[in-house]
Swiss-Prot record:
Assigned keywords, A-Z: Ribonucleoprotein, Ribosomal protein
Protein name as it appears in the record: Large ribosomal subunit protein uL30
Complexes and interactors: Part of the 50S ribosomal subunit.
NCBIfam families: rpmD_bact
Cellular component terms per the entry's GO annotation: cytosolic large ribosomal subunit
This protein's record includes keyword Ribosomal protein: yes
Gene3D superfamilies for the chain: Ribosomal protein L30, ferredoxin-like fold domain
An individual GO BP term: translation
Family membership noted in the UniProt record: Belongs to the universal ribosomal protein uL30 family.
InterPro entries (alphabetical): Ribo_uL30_ferredoxin-like_sf (IPR036919), Ribosomal_uL30_bac-type (IPR005996), Ribosomal_uL30_CS (IPR018038), Ribosomal_uL30_ferredoxin-like (IPR016082)
Length: 60
């Protein structure tokens, strides 16, 4: 696994269930097309899997 993950919010959270909104917010994403970098670990991977239809992930 890569050391870092570059996560970009590709779709809006408008109209999404509250748990998905909270997950996106917890990842540090507020606006569409915003990108954040996180360490690659099981917790982050789990959050990405939960909102995989809203984000894109690039390994660094």
């Amino acid at each position: 696994m890569a050391n870092k993950l570059e996560i970009t919010l590709k779709r809006s959270v408008i109209g999404r269930p509250e748990d998905q909104r909270v997950t996106v917010r917890t990842l540090g994403l507020k606006k569409t097309n915003q990108t954040v970098v996180h360490e690659d670990n099981a917790a982050i991977r789990g959050m990405i899997n939960k909102v995989s239809h809203l984000v894109s992930v690039k390994e660094q």
